[in-house]
Amino acid sequence: MDVIDPHSVNISYPASFSVDYIRPEVVLEIGPLAAWVPSASHRIRPYAAEEFPQLFAEPECRVIATSAERTFWEKATILHQQAHRTGPMPLRYSRHYYDLYKLAASPVSTSAIADLGLLRDVVAFKQRFYPSGWARYEDAVPGSLKLIPANAHLAELQRDYNSMQVMIHGQIPDFDEIIIALRHLEDQINGLVE
């Protein structure tokens, strides 16, 4: 259990290499402040099962996870919150920009954008459990959603993104490419004024 947050479980593991940006631990947020609706059951297969199949009697298992559409709106509202931040950007937040960039380039984007009720649910959840006047969650709706922070924060985000690239498998998109795609997504969502 996390000593500061009793609703989080920290699982530490031995690191096989040393990179300051990557902490050798996984944090599971399991308390009442985590929303599980909607969710689905998914079959997963770890990379280790591909490399060492002889070590796995059953290389696949099922996990229940929050839907990708909810994750899309969770990430969008995190970016909306950060777009209204007046102080310095927190560390390790560029991952949320990368995540939404990847989700926006997938079929998940179409189904998430078609479900504005889910956006309203995510906003209501954040207003109740993560209240913040400066986040302006009430404006996280088509017509006023902001995904891109002020220019002053973009340099901070780019530095953070440059540090986090060791976490990305495969092709690493340029930071400017991510921002351009997110500006397009912001325009697309804001064009859906209800």
Regions found by a protein language model. Give the residues of each.
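Structured mid-to-C-terminal alpha-helical surface segments
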Residues: 1-194
